[in-house]
């Protein structure tokens, strides 16, 4: 089901708005859970990808845990009925207030991103006599072969504890009685479509985990984060990502220990394809360079990815007909970066036409 099937009804609505294919979402979740289940893997939903209440309800119905990166996300997960025992709290800069709230909810684990954060969580847990469960987020220095703005696991990154600091982190744990390590956590980037990257990543994880084994440290949980990409160029060609290939290469490459649980934090791959941003053409014009421009009522305030890192989304006309020609599709914000596409191929665009921006269900 796509927005195109409901063009007549959609023309009567105020724009812009998001259109969600809830059946595609349900099918995507079912496929992800089934493929992960073949190997006993646990999937958490990265709430930052989309926290629309209907989306979150579908996630809970599918039985996924939740990955949060703010105190408000932890609160939303709790209020949405997610058990605290299935919530992990990541985020490179957690505030004291957020940490205290998550401690009070007794969430499953904090993914800790610096040596100083370990000390802060220990001190805040000690205030109420609690012991916080933590996983060390380790930066493995792996090239994810994706856009630099969504690469999060290379050496020159703000994310995680450098693998060269692992020894120091473990020594510090001996003097922090109010935290208990339950595992290690990674996340190397987003929109990764080359499966070889995940294989190389798992090889690095194996080496890091072996170091822990040699230190006599038992890791009950391995959290590999997420990163699986989707087909922005051809949303109809493969609407459900390759979960079989993704979990399969991890299973073939990752060396788990007996009794160990492997976790994933998926966001984009679960929800992106199910969402479209429907917008109306307000004006058309041609600039001095001869470029045809369609000015629409949606902007970077509704979908920031194209402005933030020149992300591509396929744009289609729901109402136009005829031969395709290139258009710049731009929003109303007073920023030159408020452009969804510089050369979207569309039939002749007229004032009042409805356009739909595909694969917009994540990170709008």
Task: Enumerate the language-model features and the residues they cover.
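Active-site loop/helix belt of alpha/beta enzymes
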Residues: 141-284, 346
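Active-site-proximal loop/turn and secondary-structure-junction residues that shape catalytic pockets
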Residues: 47-51, 72-73, 93, 114-116, ...
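Short, glycine/charged-enriched secondary-structure capping and boundary segments
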Residues: 58-59, 81-83, 103-104, 124-127, ...
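Charged (often Lys/Glu-rich) extended helix/loop segments that serve as interaction or gating elements
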Residues: 3-4, 249, 259-364
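Short beta-strand segments
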Residues: 46, 133-139, 185-187, 223-225, ...
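Conserved beta-strand positions in the central sheet of alpha/beta enzyme cores
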Residues: 67-68, 111, 135, 185, ...
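A charged N-terminal "starter" segment
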Residues: 1-132, 171, 175-180, 207-217, ...
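Hydrophobic "anchor" residues on beta-strands that sit immediately upstream
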Residues: 44, 133, 221, 261, ...
């Amino acid at each position: 089901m796509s927005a195109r099937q409901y063009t007549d009804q959609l023309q009567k609505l105020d724009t812009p708005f998001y259109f969600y294919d809830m059946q595609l979402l349900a099918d995507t979740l079912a496929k992800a859970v089934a493929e992960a289940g073949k190997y006993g893997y646990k999937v958490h939903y990265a709430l930052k990808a989309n926290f629309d209440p209907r989306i979150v309800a579908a996630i809970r119905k599918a039985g996924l845990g939740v990955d949060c990166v703010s105190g408000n996300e932890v609160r939303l997960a709790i209020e949405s009925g997610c058990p605290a025992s299935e919530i992990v709290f990541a985020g490179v800069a957690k505030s004291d207030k957020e940490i205290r709230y998550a401690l009070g909810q007794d969430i499953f684990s904090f993914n800790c991103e610096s040596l100083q954060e370990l000390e802060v969580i220990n001190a805040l847990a000690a205030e109420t006599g609690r012991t916080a469960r933590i996983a060390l987020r380790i930066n493995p220095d792996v090239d994810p072969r994706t856009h630099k703005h969504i690469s999060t696991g290379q050496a020159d990154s703000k994310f995680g504890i450098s693998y060269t600091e692992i020894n120091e982190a473990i020594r510090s744990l001996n003097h922090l009685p109010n935290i208990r390590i339950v595992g290690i956590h990674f996340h190397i980037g987003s929109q990764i479509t080359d499966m070889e990257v995940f294989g190389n990543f798992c090889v690095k994880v194996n080496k890091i985990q072996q170091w822990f084994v040699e230190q006599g440290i038992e890791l009950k949980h391995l959290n590999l984060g997420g990163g699986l990409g989707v087909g922005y160029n051809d949303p109809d060609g493969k609407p459900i990502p390759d979960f079989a290939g993704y979990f399969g290469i991890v299973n073939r490459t990752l060396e788990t220990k007996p009794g160990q649980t492997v976790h994933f934090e998926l966001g984009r791959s679960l929800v992106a394809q199910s969402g479209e941003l429907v917008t109306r053409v307000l004006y058309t014009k041609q600039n001095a360079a001869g470029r045809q421009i369609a000015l629409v009522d949606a902007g970077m305030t509704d979908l920031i990815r194209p402005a933030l890192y020149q992300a591509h989304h396929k744009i289609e006309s729901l109402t136009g007909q005829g031969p395709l020609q290139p258009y710049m599709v731009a929003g109303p914000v007073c920023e030159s970066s408020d452009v969804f596409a510089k050369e979207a191929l569309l039939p002749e665009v007229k004032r009042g036409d409805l356009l739909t921006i595909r694969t917009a269900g994540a990170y709008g």
